[in-house]
Amino acid sequence: MRDTDVEVRGDSLRGRHILLGVTGGIAAVDTVRLARELRRHGAQVTVIMTPSAQEIITPLAVRWASQGEVITDWDGDLSGLSDFDAVLVTPATRNLIASFVHGLMNGPLLMALSAARGRGSPIMM
């Protein structure tokens, strides 16, 4: 078993693509554990980190845990932000929640949340 492998605990998320949004709250330190737990239940995990989240935990650590793409900045092609079965944002800072409620889209995470809302995909914060 490699250090990136996870012990499978169930298949409730098998075939599901979960977007994990990470903001700058101190609970961002739990991102590694959460990403690995999602994978233990079969999920494919893609992560979007806000700049403030990157001050708390490194994208390298999150990439290791998720074994998926980690988006940290704007990219010319954001079309992939709508290919998720659900979005989980943790920690969800008051700033992010307020921005989402008011329809702001000033970053990749808010763009993905807007796309998920438009599709009717589950959003958990």
Name what the model sees in each region.
Residues 1-125:
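A cross-family phosphate/adenosyl-ligand binding-site feature
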